[in-house]
Amino acid sequence: MAAIDMFNSNTDPFQEELMKALQPYTTNTDSSSPTYSNTVFGFNQTTSLGLNQLTPYQIHQIQNQLNQRRNIISPNLAPKPVPMKNMTAQKLYRGVRQRHWGKWVAEIRLPKNRTRLWLGTFDTAEEAAMAYDLAAYKLRGEFARLNFPQFRHEDGYYGGGSCFNPLHSSVDAKLQEICQSLRKTEDIDLPCSETELFPPKTEYQESEYGFLRSDENSFSDESHVESSSPESGITTFLDFSDSGFDEIGSFGLEKFPSVEIDWDAISKLSES
């Protein structure tokens, strides 16, 4: 019983729990302690009831009971869980995406061939967004959709007068070359000139014979066609000088003589 006295002399509460757990196994033990047959996992084992004669299964069972009691008695001794910080969603910008190592990249789609132009790698998303805005304004002008439209009307900010230029010099030179090529293609693709889009107006003057067209270009075009046609020689033999075109111009009609029968003249001829 020396082992039992040692546990009783200790004031640790867990040791008292251990003694309570060992009570079924520490019955009256003496020099002639009886033996009994114990079946563990289907095997017959003959063991003594002394404290120093516990089987491994009994020791494991006692440890489980002690762990359960410790969790019930002292729950505050366990470390408190630390809540994770709520990760706020990063604001997304047009033409900007993040690499898995944390850097931000910017790229823009060209208007003609729909390919992407690499604008560079940046430390912050805002800097990458500014690089995209600068490239978009150079390519599309006032029609560009920007991440920061409030800077559009600031003097020199997107026009190149600002000292802040997030684009690399090589990227900026490539962008300028693309802009020049786009301007050339736009000049070539013009469908027609301004004179063809807006033809000269024709004016009409009112007269007693109706409305007369006073388009100078029409007269010049008609005279040019007559002179250039192979049948223009025929018109030279026609003489309209004696006709009645003097009063009403080239658009008048000559008066024909009356076709009524003059009976007075016929009667005079018959009398004579």
Curated annotation (Swiss-Prot):
A GO cellular component entry from the record: nucleus
Subcellular location: Nucleus
GO BP annotations listed: ethylene-activated signaling pathway
Record's keyword annotation contains Transcription regulation: yes
GO molecular function, one term: DNA-binding transcription factor activity
Family: Belongs to the AP2/ERF transcription factor family. ERF subfamily.
Protein name (database record): Ethylene-responsive transcription factor ERF060
Annotated organism of origin: Arabidopsis thaliana
